[in-house]
């Protein structure tokens, strides 16, 4: 059964009526209301298109968090072959919130990083809801070093509310691990492409997104803090999260305008959760285009282009 967000109620009602009419139409009793069903389906699709063409930043945040939205594991299955995960940071342990692997992307050998939130109670706990600990970011550095050593492009898929803020994580050097991961990404001699597929929260996101090309799915969000966190700090009132989301400029459209991301990946009407296969295919095409634009650059040119990209952020605001 499809899960609807609160603001999708008008669409939900129309689609419920479509299902009711389909149930009434039976070939056995000669009743056919196909024309009426088709007309109502058209209205529902039109309502959905209009709704998603004018989503507020807060509504986009809810879409980015939709429980049925495709996660890293879904993208990994749809985009890569010969996917071979690597475990552990060689210092403390394994962190399943951040996955690292060797793989092939459309026949080309690559390294892959990505946050995994999980889709069931069991997997969400195992992956810590996509909130990586220091060992996750140290594993990311390890993957980046392997990418550099073997001359493999790096593809990162970002989907996290932020790095895990627990006491143990802080004791093991969370801030240092994030900083080193960000630095490693900026210093890579191979091309790297990052895609924000859902939430891109704070340093936990940018730690694997310091890339030559940064892409965002159409209804993803990318920010220094969650809207709820910003509202709590600024107004001491989490109910103002919608206002915070608007003021923070967290949408792909705003961030493209500011030069923080390089391109937007169009999602199916109604969001990636309505047609994960199409969303994943569009993401793959965007990654291929981004990687193609970086092909042929030597290590020095790759680093210079990346450095220039990040130094330019904010100059035209």
Swiss-Prot record:
Function: Component of the acetyl coenzyme A carboxylase (ACC) complex. First, biotin carboxylase catalyzes the carboxylation of biotin on its carrier protein (BCCP) and then the CO(2) group is transferred by the carboxyltransferase to acetyl-CoA to form malonyl-CoA.
Designated gene of the protein: accA
EC number: 2.1.3.15
Organism (species): Azorhizobium caulinodans (strain ATCC 43989 / DSM 5975 / JCM 20966 / LMG 6465 / NBRC 14845 / NCIMB 13405 / ORS 571)
Assembly notes: Acetyl-CoA carboxylase is a heterohexamer composed of biotin carboxyl carrier protein (AccB), biotin carboxylase (AccC) and two subunits each of ACCase subunit alpha (AccA) and ACCase subunit beta (AccD).
Pathway involvement of the protein, from the record: Lipid metabolism; malonyl-CoA biosynthesis; malonyl-CoA from acetyl-CoA: step 1/1
Entry's family note: Belongs to the AccA family.
Localisation per UniProt entry: Cytoplasm
GO biological process: fatty acid biosynthetic process; malonyl-CoA biosynthetic process
Sorted UniProt keywords: ATP-binding, Cytoplasm, Fatty acid biosynthesis, Fatty acid metabolism, Lipid biosynthesis, Lipid metabolism, Nucleotide-binding, Transferase
GO molecular function, one term: ATP binding
Enzymatic reactions: N(6)-carboxybiotinyl-L-lysyl-[protein] + acetyl-CoA = N(6)-biotinyl-L-lysyl-[protein] + malonyl-CoA
Protein name: Acetyl-coenzyme A carboxylase carboxyl transferase subunit alpha
Record GO cellular component, one term: acetyl-CoA carboxylase complex
CoA carboxyltransferase C-terminal domain segment(s): 39-293
Top-level class of the enzyme under EC nomenclature: transferase
């Amino acid at each position: 059964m499809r899960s609807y967000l609160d603001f999708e109620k008008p669409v939900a009602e129309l689609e419920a009526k479509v299902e009711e009419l389909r149930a009434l139409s039976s070939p056995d009793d000669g009743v056919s209301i196909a024309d009426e069903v088709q007309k109502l389906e058209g209205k529902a699709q039109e309502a959905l298109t209009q709704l998603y063409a004018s989503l507020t930043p807060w509504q986009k945040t809810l879409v980015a968090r939709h429980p049925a939205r495709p996660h890293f594991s879904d993208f990994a299955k749809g985009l890569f072959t010969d996917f071979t995960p690597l475990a552990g940071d060689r210092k403390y342990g394994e962190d399943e919130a951040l996955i690292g692997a060797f793989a092939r992307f459309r026949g080309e050998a690559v390294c892959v990083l990505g946050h995994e939130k999980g889709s069931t109670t069991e997997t969400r706990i195992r992956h810590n809801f996509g909130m990586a600990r220091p060992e996750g970011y140290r594993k990311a550095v390890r993957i980046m070093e392997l990418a550099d050593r073997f001359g493999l492009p790096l593809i990162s898929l970002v989907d996290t509310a932020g790095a895990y803020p627990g006491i143990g994580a802080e004791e093991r050097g969370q801030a240092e691990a994030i900083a080193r991961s960000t630095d490693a990404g900026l210093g890579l001699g191979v091309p790297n492409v990052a895609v924000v597929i859902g939430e891109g929260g704070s340093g936990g996101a940018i730690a694997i997104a310091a890339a030559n090309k940064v892409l965002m799915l159409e209804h993803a969000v990318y920010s220094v803090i969650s809207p709820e966190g910003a509202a709590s700090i600024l107004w001491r009132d989490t109910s103002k999260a919608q206002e915070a989301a608007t003021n923070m400029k967290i949408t792909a459209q705003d961030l493209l305008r500011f030069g923080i991301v390089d391109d937007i990946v169009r999602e199916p009407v109604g969001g990636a959760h309505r047609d994960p296969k199409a969303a994943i295919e569009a993401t793959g095409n965007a990654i291929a285009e981004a990687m193609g634009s970086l092909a042929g650059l030597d290590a020095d040119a790759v680093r210079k282009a990346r450095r220039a990209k990040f130094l330019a952020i904010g100059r035209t605001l």
